[in-house]
């Protein structure tokens, strides 16, 4: 396994010494002085909440922190703005009311140079706490951005930059409040799929996972705790997989009211306020903001999943009918559908077909939507590839996940250009395994040692993939279990069980030997797991995929 971590022992035992001084971020002093001046002047401040999990947690952390210092000021002088639909940045000066003296944009706006100038000319200060790449610093805003200077930890997301800002305020005010919100830091960083390789990021996220304080995080964890524990317990990966999607779904397809309830449920001083219940059959009753937000998140995520599945099925038929996989970039043009979930569907298509993928929706003479890519399959920076071709109006966001727009007249030209530029790329499915082991040599100790590291798995510190060869399946060691009778269990002679969940009847039939003395031989790819039962640890391999390599009527 090679994760780019130089010292594994150090990585597993990070301390506060692995964090860097906040002053290593350029403009930290300027930003703190700007905020302090407006608080001292009792000015009105506008906080622009960015439309994803990192954006919501970034703004919530700042609000919670400032409320501990200046509760009256925060409740009376700071307004927050949430865009309708899924949008990023300040976007327009129209959202800034005449009485606003300072605009704060956590997790966005580094490259909105013209808007910064426009607001500055109106006498409005702008404080940006961001992590997105931009060509340069803005002349008209105070920008604190770990991507624009020499700050070593590039894997901090927006909420990480906000945290560093609050740590600086801690030092100036001789308080220790910032670390109280590390659960928000952990959620935002993992939701934004930031690398977990850096020692500082590892330290912040692992500490955030140790204790949940935030009302909404606690409520969503209570809903997902069983699934999380079944998947090995809390880890950066499980936080991103089980909890972050609730916030991202609401940010994508929720109404402004639903998103406002969500944001307020992240605020410790608002989360337990009583509001009119929207629960079916509870008209006239009251409930807390966080209770309503947690239920909304669940319903919205379910609604989003249904919309995603409908559009995904339509897109799959388009891919086959139009032979779109003949192109190097999988470009889908949608006349209808829900643009807010384009990124979700694009992720599924990248996982299945391994091509860089664009899902674009018609908007007048333009096609606009989401781009996704997996750099493991060859193209390291999809966003830069699109920017370099001069056929794209914009490509804004992260290297492998961003929004883009192409003029209708340039679609065919872009396809032709990309096919030529990427002609040497295969984008074929490749499973990069960490270990190849014969089934007879697989040991319980090996599985338990890896399984006990579940708490570190995250982006770029991925769970090891194990290739197990020559697994002999007989009627004696094969069983089908579970309420739905769709879980295949293969028990090896040394007590290790191989589990395949969600199996079809055809799979079960294919893996069942033809005779009572027969054998089916498979090779499998899977991950290590520990099944805790009656205070005992049992080693398991969870099978992701397999191939049948042999079948015989007699096995000895």
Listing of model-derived features with the role each one plays in the protein:
Residues 37, 41, 199, 284-333, ...:
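Mid-to-C-terminal polyanion-binding domains and interfaces
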Residues 137-191, 397-398:
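Short alpha-helices
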Residues 106, 129-131, 144-146, 360:
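Generic beta-sheet signal
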Residues 112, 132-137, 150-151, 364-367, ...:
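Short gly/pro/ser/thr-enriched loop/turn and capping motifs at secondary-structure boundaries
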Residues 108-121:
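Active-site core of PLP-dependent enzymes with the aminotransferase class I/II
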Residues 102-108:
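Short acidic, glycine-rich surface-loop motifs adjacent to enzyme active sites
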């Amino acid at each position: 396994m090679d994760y780019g971590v130089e010292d594994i022992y150090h990585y597993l035992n990070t301390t506060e010494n692995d964090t860097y001084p906040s002053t290593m971020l350029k403009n930290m002093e300027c930003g703190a002085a700007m905020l302090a001046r407006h608080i001292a002047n009792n000015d009105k401040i506008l906080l622009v909440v960015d439309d994803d999990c990192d954006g919501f947690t970034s703004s919530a952390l700042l609000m919670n922190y400032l409320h501990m210092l200046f509760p009256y000021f925060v409740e009376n002088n700071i307004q927050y703005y949430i865009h309708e639909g899924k949008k990023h940045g300040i976007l327009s000066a129209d959202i800034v009311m005449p009485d606003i003296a300072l605009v704060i944009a956590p997790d966005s706006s580094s490259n909105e140079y013209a808007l910064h100038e426009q607001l500055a000319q109106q006498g409005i200060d702008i404080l940006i706490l961001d992590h997105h790449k931009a060509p340069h610093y803005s002349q008209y805003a105070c920008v604190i951005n770990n991507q624009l200077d020499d700050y070593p930890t590039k894997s901090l997301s927006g909420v990480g930059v906000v945290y560093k800002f609050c740590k600086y305020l801690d030092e100036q005010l001789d308080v220790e409040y910032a670390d109280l919100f590390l659960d928000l830091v952990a959620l935002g960083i993992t939701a934004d799929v930031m690398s977990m390789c850096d020692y500082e990021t590892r330290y912040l996220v692992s500490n955030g996972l140790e204790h949940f304080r935030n009302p909404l995080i606690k409520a969503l964890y209570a809903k997902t705790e069983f699934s999380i524990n079944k998947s090995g317990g809390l880890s950066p990966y499980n936080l991103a997989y089980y909890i972050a999607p609730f916030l991202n779904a609401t940010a994508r397809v929720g109404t402004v009211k639903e998103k406002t309830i969500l944001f307020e449920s992240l605020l410790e001083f608002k989360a337990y306020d009583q509001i009119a219940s929207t629960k079916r059959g509870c008209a006239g009753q009251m409930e807390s903001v966080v209770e309503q937000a947690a239920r909304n998140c669940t319903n919205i995520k379910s609604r989003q999943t249904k919309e995603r599945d409908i559009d995904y099925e339509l897109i799959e038929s388009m891919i086959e009918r139009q032979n779109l996989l003949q192109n190097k970039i999988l470009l889908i043009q949608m006349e209808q559908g829900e643009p807010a979930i384009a990124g979700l569907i694009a992720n599924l298509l990248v996982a299945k077909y391994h091509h860089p993928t664009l899902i674009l929706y018609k908007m007048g003479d333009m096609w606009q939507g989401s781009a996704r890519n997996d750099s493991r399959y060859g193209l390291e920076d999809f966003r830069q590839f699109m920017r370099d071709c001069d056929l794209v109006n914009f490509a804004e966001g992260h290297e492998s996940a961003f929004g883009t727009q192409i003029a209708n007249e340039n679609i065919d030209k872009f396809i032709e250009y990309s096919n030529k530029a990427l002609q040497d790329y295969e984008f074929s499915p490749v499973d990069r395994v960490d270990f190849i082991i014969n089934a007879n040599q697989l040991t319980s100790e090996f599985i338990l040692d890896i399984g006990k590291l579940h708490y570190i798995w995250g982006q770029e510190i991925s769970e090891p993939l194990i290739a197990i060869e020559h697994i002999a399946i007989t009627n004696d060691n094969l069983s089908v279990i579970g309420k739905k009778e769709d879980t295949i269990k293969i028990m090896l002679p040394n007590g290790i069980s191989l589990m395949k969940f969600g199996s079809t009847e055809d799979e079960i039939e294919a893996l069942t030997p033809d005779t009572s003395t027969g054998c089916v031989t498979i090779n499998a790819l899977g991950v290590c797991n520990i099944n805790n039962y009656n205070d005992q640890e049992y080693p398991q391999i969870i099978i992701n995929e397999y191939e049948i390599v042999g079948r015989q009527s007699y096995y000895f």
